[in-house]
């Protein structure tokens, strides 16, 4: 684990950093780099709605190509599926020997969708939290733990540069863990697919369906399997599974111990291993690329099918009753 004393902020302060993208992570990186005394410009395509916001927040903005030409450290924080085209069209033609190309996620490098020149340092600085939290912690004098990795190191100074960058966005205040592009990418994708997004979503929908099919009101099913999930996850987030079990009733704890393994059994683990293999061998990324090349048609169809599930209809109606719940733009427009 690396902390403030292990990183030299002057290294990144002596470089020119171009941040490509101004989404959740892009705005947090750009503003915190600036506040740490780093020269920074933001790269956004002409016509981007975020350009006005960048200027309002006191940052310089230009096209990705112009920023790549100006910078000697380029942090690519555009969406995964857009990065290869941005690299090919805007970044690669403007790279020079000694430049560094940074990422917030390792997918495009690990699976060979982006292949930088050998003379360019390739590294990753990945905060383990959303951008708004990264920025808020930085402003409060704290930080969010980060992962760093170096894939190409022609100068032998890649790790020091990555640590310096991590320090500039507050990461070394909390702690920085050294990893590899392979491990970060594969664990991140597996967590998303098997547990956080895919697994949890299907578990919630299955529970809802079982209750409704058994004759219970959809509203009650929604509260029991979706709404109250936040209470449980918050307890786990704060103190792990043990904290959650300590905090719930004895009835809930006992029932969970008995019934949980009936839902998630050895067969579930076998299917999880299949998901992991599909990630490791590149099958998932091939499907992801095919979807993008096909105009996102498969993704749009899957979105449509999931949006039509009864739990979404019931949930929207119930959330109208909850003044304390922040409403997404799609429900307030």
From Swiss-Prot:
GO terms for molecular function: ketol-acid reductoisomerase activity; magnesium ion binding; NADP binding. InterPro entries: 6-PGluconate_DH-like_C_sf (IPR008927), KARI (IPR013023), KARI_C (IPR000506), KARI_N (IPR013116), KARI_prok (IPR014359), NAD(P)-bd_dom_sf (IPR036291). Keywords: Amino-acid biosynthesis, Branched-chain amino acid biosynthesis, Magnesium, Metal-binding, NADP, Oxidoreductase. It comes from the Bacteria. The lineage of its organism: Bacteria, Bacillati, Actinomycetota, Actinomycetes, Mycobacteriales. This is Ketol-acid reductoisomerase (NADP(+)). Pathway: Amino-acid biosynthesis; L-isoleucine biosynthesis; L-isoleucine from 2-oxobutanoate: step 2/4; Amino-acid biosynthesis; L-valine biosynthesis; L-valine from pyruvate: step 2/4. The active site is at 105. HAMAP family: IlvC (MF_00435). Its cofactor is Mg(2+). One of its GO terms (biological process) is L-valine biosynthetic process.
